[in-house]
Amino acid sequence: MFRTAVMMAASLALTGAVVAHAYYLKHQFYPTVVYLTKSSPSMAVLYIQAFVLVFLLGKVMGKVFFGQLRAAEMEHLLERSWYAVTETCLAFTVFRDDFSPRFVALFTLLLFLKCFHWLAEDRVDFMERSPNISWLFHCRIVSLMFLLGILDFLFVSHAYHSILTRGASVQLVFGFEYAILMTMVLTIFIKYVLHSVDLQSENPWDNKAVYMLYTELFTGFIKVLLYMAFMTIMIKVHTFPLFAIRPMYLAMRQFKKAVTDAIMSRRAIRNMNTLYPDATPEELQAMDNVCIICREEMVTGAKRLPCNHIFHTSCLRSWFQRQQTCPTCRMDVLRASLPAQSPPPPEPADQGPPPAPHPPPLLPQPPNFPQGLLPPFPPGMFPLWPPMGPFPPVPPPPSSGEAVAPPSTSAAALSRPSGAATTTAAGTSATAASATASGPGSGSAPEAGPAPGFPFPPPWMGMPLPPPFAFPPMPVPPAGFAGLTPEELRALEGHERQHLEARLQSLRNIHTLLDAAMLQINQYLTVLASLGPPRPATSVNSTEETATTVVAAASSTSIPSSEATTPTPGASPPAPEMERPPAPESVGTEEMPEDGEPDAAELRRRRLQKLESPVAH
């Protein structure tokens, strides 16, 4: 207040000094006025004095029509005033040819009236939050709206007649500006009427938010039309109105928001009426039955949102007109709402009792696998690998002090079985061979068997895999829903809390299956990376001896499996001459596998033949 008084006194002193100086030079009234209008410093001082007078007039009118302004109203006024002053300066650059004291006075008057329109809008919006409205408040607002409406209409009429008589000029800008201010006065008046009707009723008016929403939609559409017409005319007649870009953008954004709010509110209210269940008395008693929107107790007519918060139906309807979220947790009710269930088609009256619904399919029980085996991989994970059984351990190569078993016996013990009985026999033979190799007197440690939980080695590796670590079992894949009827699927879908929890649990199960599959793959790759390349076979004899050994090993596979005997524990004497394999020329060639490469068992048998060849010769 003190700064305002100092500024007013300084402006008044400067104005008096300038006028006295001009009169001292000219000594007459008319020459003094001419001198003041032609002198730029004198005009600057007079402009400052005019602004001070306008400021004082605004203070007086504010006291008359508003009384004491609130802090929020002053903040909004200053924020909008800065933008208005910037737009006015841009308008001065567009109409620099028409720049004159009259032009400045018209823009100052326009800014002055805009300030009162903004204050009237804020004060009417305050009616909704104020519990007590006095008659003085009504008299002030009604008289202010009446005065602003008359002034806006007069300035629009003046601009219209000026354009008709003098052509397109700066009055085109003022005409459209005052027309937009008239739409603002119309919006303020409708809101005032709605708030007044709501204050007169004891209970809250449910339809007030609907009328306010459609009022903003209607007035926003009018503003958009006015700005589009103004931009089109200004571009054709004068130039591009740069100062009108920001208010036009704000008007279009406000109109778009009004349209979106109207659509979303209708959708939210429709969902509330169709999807949200009514709150039962038990639910109201089990929780705090005070509606946080109106702060009144809920007895009847309450709705429960998908987030399990309960409110009055009328309060929710008014709330959804403004925003489509839960008043408590801010959950988007449009995204959380599920589509309504389609009612089942009516059944004919002459039909018998409906058949019993099919029971939901039970999840398959996990099969029992032998110790150290994994369940098979899900179908489609490794399509090129056929299912394989447990791979038998390989007996270690005999040391120098131990006897060498006949090739036919080793081949029969290491050959892959084809049936269950053969599998048992082969496993027993391999176990006996391992026990013989690791018995007392052996000079080498036993080789590691297959990895527990990993039933097969890589197809290109000849040595058994070391046990890396224990693998967790593969989870059982979930069952499908192909056998369910549409009615059962609708019943399983559901819209309650337990159905949502079931869906979340299914997603967690899928996540667990994916994690288990990736874990198995990573463990398999880790085992492969930890193993080195296969050791090359040592060349003991010449090329002729190697070929003879290979043919002899091939002939040993033609001996029936019934003639194969299991070696006994302990060291055995060298094989006699009659037990040696037949000559190579009397043996046919062995059939190779389909892929043209010998398998792991064949490679191991050949190595045993190479180690045995010095003893044979």
UniProtKB/Swiss-Prot annotation:
Ranges annotated as biased composition (Pro residues): 341-375
This protein's record includes keyword Methyltransferase: no
Lumenal domain ranges by topology: 26-41, 120-140, 191-224
Region described as Necessary and sufficient for SEL1L interaction: spans on this chain: 1-84
Coiled-coil spans in chain: none
Result when mutating C329S: Abolishes E3 ligase activity
EC number(s) recorded for this UniProt protein: 2.3.2.27
Protein name, as recorded: E3 ubiquitin-protein ligase synoviolin
Residues that hold Zn(2+) 2 according to the record: C307, H309, C326, C329
Documented effect of changing R503L: Loss of interaction with FAM8A1, HERPUD1, OS9 and UBE2J1, impaired degradation of immature core-glycosylated basigin/CD147
Organism listed in the record: Homo sapiens (Human)
Subcellular location: Endoplasmic reticulum membrane
